[in-house]
Amino acid sequence: MIRINNLQKNFGTKKAVDIENYTIGQGDMLGLVGNNGAGKTTLFRLILDLLQADRGNVTINDIDVSKSEDWKNFTGAFIDDGFLIDYLTPEEYFYFIGKMYGLKKEEVDERLLPFERFMIGEVMGQKKFIRNYSAGNKQKIGIISAMLHHPQLLILD
């Protein structure tokens, strides 16, 4: 599903990412553990084409992420709360994300049901902007929005 080929990213003289070849198959789960500054977030940003590699490429389902955006239709991601539109309420944000994937309001409401117990009283119905939530609740909002369209691939940092 994800293929990394000769991927390299440097920041000045610091080599942040240097992966010769690596494949993550369908159904695989991978966790990255490392010190601060080890390149974990940089790798996620390269995979999601949020950062340009110095060398190499990433393909998702044989689609080069730097040449096509088709992979976004079946990929969900949440890296940090910078992904969130913080001047919206969570409800507005979920409907916005749903609309991006062609979901109607009713479909979004239905897809939010499994997450109700994590959100009732804390996130949903509060009528406040995302910027006013705790870091933990912002993470909940981001993770749920990444899963809203039932992606085949989920990338979380």
What are these regions (language model features)?
Residues 148-152:
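A short, proline-enriched helix->beta-strand linker immediately N-terminal to the Walker B motif
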Residues 143:
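Hydrophobic anchor residue at the start of the ABC signature
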Residues 56-71:
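Conserved ABC transporter NBD signature motif
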Residues 129-134:
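Conserved ABC ATPase signature
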Residues 30-35:
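The feature captures the beta-strand-to-loop junction immediately N-terminal to the Walker
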Residues 2, 17-19, 72:
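Conserved structural motif at the start of ABC-family nucleotide-binding domains
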Residues 48:
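Helix-to-loop junction immediately C-terminal to a conserved catalytic motif
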